[in-house]
Amino acid sequence: MRLDDIIGDVIFLSFKNPERMQAIGIKELSGHYMLKGYDQMGLWLEHPGIKIQHMEDENGRPLPADQQFHEEIDAVFMVHWDNVDNMMHYPKRKGFDLP
């Protein structure tokens, strides 16, 4: 199997050093992520969710609690090759092996 064949699929990945991922909100030792691509530096994976809470208006003034809101941001993050411990793909598993 080649990585090119599973781009766009959901894979299982465990990290050698999960502390390196904490700065971007990934706190788990392992998880399931959509593989978006790869390069000489590592794997590009879809971030499971970044939420930003808007607490100020456009002028920097605090918003009342009932006007504050959350925004979900789409993001892709990199796992360097030296931080990949294990990787697993699920051929033909519904919801994981995507066309």
Tell me the role of every PLM-derived stretch:
Residues 1-99:
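Eukaryotic intrinsically disordered, low-complexity regulatory linkers and tails enriched in Ser/Thr/Pro
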